[in-house]
Amino acid sequence: MASERGKVKHNWSSTSEGCPRKRSCLREPCDVAPSSRPAQRSASRSGGPSSPKRLKAQKEDDVACSRRLSWGSSRRRNNSSSSFSPHFLGPGVGGAASKGCLIRNTRGFLSSGGSPLRPANASLEEMASLEEEACSLKVDSKDSSHNSTNSEFAAEAEGQNDTIEEPNKVQKRKRDRLRDQGSTMIYLKAIQGILGKSMPKRKGEAATRAKPSAAEHPSHGEGPARSEGPAKTAEGAARSVTVTAAQKEKDATPEVSMEEDKTVPERSSFYDRRVVIDPQEKPSEEPLGDRRTVIDKCSPPLEFLDDSDSHLEIQKHKDREVVMEHPSSGSDWSDVEEISTVRFSQEEPVSLKPSAVPEPSSFTTDYVMYPPHLYSSPWCDYASYWTSSPKPSSYPSTGSSSNDAAQVGKSSRSRMSDYSPNSTGSVQNTSRDMEASEEGWSQNSRSFRFSRSSEEREVKEKRTFQEEMPPRPCGGHASSSLPKSHLEPSLEEGFIDTHCHLDMLYSKLSFQGTFTKFRKIYSSSFPKEFQGCISDFCDPRTLTDCLWEELLKEDLVWGAFGCHPHFARYYSESQERNLLQALRHPKAVAFGEMGLDYSYKCTTPVPEQHKVFERQLQLAVSLKKPLVIHCREADEDLLEIMKKFVPPDYKIHRHCFTGSYPVIEPLLKYFPNMSVGFTAVLTYSSAWEAREALRQIPLERIIVETDAPYFLPRQVPKSLCQYAHPGLALHTVREIARVKDQPLSLTLAALRENTSRLYSL
């Protein structure tokens, strides 16, 4: 028997690929009890008195060897391309090393403390049987992956196994092995429970730092503690790995994570174990790249990481976005509904029907929508909060209830059906010197700066907020304010002059320069609330001088293009081509002004006016551009023509209304999306009919305009401004607020909303 065992050992040593370390693995047992078996066999054979001494010396040698092999063998095993089974280590590239480990593991079942296994002084046949079975198992596994040299070992081992092994001992050995495995698992679980919670370690560094510690995570559960070796060896390996990882990772990073050897007792994945064992981790202690761990962890709603971990915070919030979307700005977001001076979307459903419907819900059809890139920001340097006019005492302070929120421009909707038809009356015409447009306009080329720095900002801000609160009666002052720091420019009160003639104004003042320069010159009369103007180019003959293009390059300037009835007699196909070309400009927001003028100042024949007016209506509707309508002493004919060519729900600006309410009422009824523009004529004491009409027209259907350079406000001395300009529209806004008995801030916001709805600004 001894000679056969020596032969087997010799063959194993010779096929270890010339590696003396692997060959020495057989001669260095890895535990005390297995290492005593050769000594016991020698003692039983010789019966000499030297057996106890030899046994003691061998034990001491084995104790020193066990710790060394627990790391060395696993390192060789991890570096090889071997495949391991759940219970037995399979063949590796280093055959001798794997065989040595297999014999060591098999012996471990006979010596694990705490298991009722065989005593160390078992009979020779039992010891031989155990070792031969190990050889047999090793040789059987090597048959599938190694050469014919390994087959020779298998034949010898099978012969020995057939001669010695007994069936009843095999069964008992299997039961002992299972018990030993169970105790090992329990012990390792205890180690994990104690050490796993006290060792911070990041998953990303686990594999790198565990390689020298024999803790690399294998694909099939490979690792030093995975082998069914003695409990002491497993304990030593586990303790070594944990201590090493703890020393290296204690000061490194957060994240309490399981180590690879903690997966020994179970086949559950490494990531699942992490989640189960460490469910109470802080959100900032996140493993890099482990999304499942991040998702499954519960964390407080506000946790700030450094920039390097920002993507992890984003990943966290994706799974909790229902609960904590916008966690850092939630209060600001909830306060939006309390802002009276918010900027509203043009898509808001508003009923403008004058029928007896106290709570209108929506327009008859959708608005005519335009691409957002057509518009530039109306606020650049004029974004500061409304401070020049005193707030009424009824204007709520910061923090008012949200029930009073978002009522801007809605207060008079309930009065939509209050007005009733009256007998038609004559239009009070205010004389305007439109012939000035035919005078010598400056045709000189003008130098303007082109600036669209805030064009994209307008696209973002255009639909900042959609008002969805129900309407309230006219008397209710349901507005509130916030400090400047809480308001964006788009949410602040301001106005846009919806109709002016910058080309005529520049000509009258002999001004050459940019609109920015013009505002600086007249800065004393341009209030902070000014947010832009729509310049109307109503003489197609002037579209060839390129002045309009230079003006539209300016911030806070938009354009409308059409043919005024005063110039309809000059209308031609070439002018129409120029007109349509100008309307293709991104900042061209309307078609007009156009219409009918039966006053003595208009020299164009009426039939010619009708023809040009009808042609422009058809073009405008085909282009889906809002209409800018001029009408003087021709209201009935105007309505009849518009009914033929304009849909009832079309967006219309009835420009510079100065007449009585019965004149405008039929248009308001037939065109629910029509808005009425009022100028500084309201400030004149003689314009009592216009003020009376203003009282009866709902605030939500009113817009402000200057019609500059005409209609200088009564309060403005000519020494300050000889002609009206867009900044002076604030005087008209104040008069509208006075006539409507509304706070100035609410009136400003309502007019701004109406402008946005009509022109999508």
Swiss-Prot record:
Keyword Cell division: no
Low complexity composition-biased segments: 33-52, 66-85, 388-402
InterPro entries assigned to the protein according to its UniProt record, in alphabetical order: DNase_TatD-rel_CS, Metal_Hydrolase, TatD-like
Binding site for a divalent metal cation 2: 593, 630, 655
Disulfide bond entries: none
One Pfam family this sequence matches: TatD_DNase
Cofactor: record remark: No activity in the presence of Ca(2+). Mild activity in the presence of Mn(2+).
UniProt key word Nuclease: yes
Any single GO CC term annotated in Swiss-Prot or TrEMBL for this entry: nucleoplasm
Biased composition (Basic and acidic residues): 247-294, 452-470
GO MF annotation, one: metal ion binding
Biased composition (Polar residues): 417-431
EC code: 3.1.13.-
Coiled coil spans: none
Subcellular location field: Nucleus
Residues binding a divalent metal cation 1: 499, 501, 593, 707
Region (Disordered): 1-90, 135-181, 197-294, 318-337, 343-364, 388-486
Cofactor(s) listed: Mg(2+)
Keyword annotations of the record: Exonuclease, Hydrolase, Metal-binding, Nuclease, Nucleus
TM region(s), chain numbering: none
Enzyme class: hydrolase
Protein family membership: Belongs to the metallo-dependent hydrolases superfamily. TatD-type hydrolase family.
The protein's role, per its UniProt record: Mg(2+)-dependent 3'RNA exonuclease and endonuclease that resolves R-loops via specific degradation of R-loop RNA stucture. Shows no activity against D-loop and minimal activity against the RNA strand of an RNA-DNA hybrid duplex oligomer. Has no 3' or 5' exonuclease activity, no uracil glycosylase activity, and no 5' flap endonuclease activity on DNA substrates. May have a role in maintaining genomic stability through its role in R-loop resolution.
Descriptive protein name: 3'-5' RNA nuclease TATDN2
Organism of provenance: Homo sapiens
Gene expressing this chain: TATDN2
